[in-house]
Amino acid sequence: TLLGCCVVLPLSAKEDRLVLVGASYGKNVLAICEADGTVLWKHDTAGPQRGHTGHHDVHYLKSGNILFHDTWTKTQEISLGKKVVWEYESAKANGNEGKRVDVHAFARFPDGSTMIAESGIGRFIHVDKKGATQKVVSMGEGGRKSTRLVRMLGNLLGKSLNVNK
């Protein structure tokens, strides 16, 4: 049984019997499960030994791959064969070296580029498949510099961590 803090998403409207789970805080696993909880596929993730204790976002992509964050700074796309097919290290890329950054949310655009919410730094960065910056949007000042969840709805809708700061 996969218990703990989880992100649970149906894989698609057509496959509503399958569920993608990101279980953390001691479980440190991604899984595809039947609706009854039977695990069909499982991938162990970094966990606390690499400073990571929570999956706040996970996406099942049209390609059949999974987009998730393996540490607080590394966003990865893996195949169901568990091969890393894309990754972006926010701690080292695009001017972030030496800065405090943590990633809680991200999304893939139809063209294959990716939006990553870089909390601490306080920006939404849009990178291409090679990791080059396409666009940067500031999260604003104060408590808005940290997010937990972001969704693209024609704009960016973000859940702030410390709204009253």
Please identify what each model-predicted range represents:
Residues 1-10:
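Bacterial N-terminal signal peptides
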Residues 14-165:
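Secretory-pathway ectodomains
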